[in-house]
Amino acid sequence: MLISLDFGITITDILRKKDDGTLIHQMLPTNQKPSEQFIQELFKDLDLKEEVDRIALTGGHHQLIGEEIDETPVIHVNEVDAIGEGGLAVSKLDASKPAIIVSSGTGTACILAKDGVFTHCSGTGVGGGTVLGLSKLLLNTVDPQEIQDLANKGLAKGTD
């Protein structure tokens, strides 16, 4: 099994890739700095040493974690590279052509992908954190899954 965590300012994204290729995605509000103990608690249902091949980390403060947890290798990924590689993979864009990858988290980052190099070229502080704040005020929830479920029921025609 492979595990990846993105420690965002507002949300921590967790992705498990099982040996059969099944992906399990989970989002949690970020309420503490990353630590080995926090990761062990997240995966208390697993024997990290026996069941997990490696753990990949990115996002804020990922560097607080060492190079292994319970003898499982930890890979640290620069967030700009993670956004660039992930954006190209998800979009299926031709990596030989320049592209701008946009990631909306607590803020919004614009990453230039060109010649195999990823560069932060622009961004704004408005992003997912703004959505969470508005959701708390208007919907009385900050649960990302509940917000997503409500958004899926909405009609985009009514937006500007």
Which residues are covered by each model-predicted region?
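Short glycine-aspartate micro-motif
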Residues: 2-6, 52-56, 98-103, 123
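Short glycine-rich, Thr/Ser-proximal phosphate-binding strand/loop in the N-terminal lobe
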Residues: 2-37, 41, 118
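A short acidic Gly-Thr/Ser loop motif
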Residues: 6-11, 60, 102-107, 125-128
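Short beta-strand-to-turn element immediately C-terminal to the catalytic PLP-Schiff-base lysine
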Residues: 17, 111-114, 137
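Short beta-strand-loop/turn "lid" adjacent to the catalytic site in phosphate-handling enzymes
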Residues: 24-30, 45-79, 113-120
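Helical "lid/coupling" subdomains associated with nucleotide-phosphate turnover
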Residues: 30-40, 65-66, 83-88, 98, ...
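Conserved phosphate-binding catalytic cores of ATP/NTP-utilizing and phosphoryl-transfer enzymes
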Residues: 75-102, 107-116
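Glycine-rich phosphate-binding loop plus the immediately following alpha-helix
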Residues: 117-160
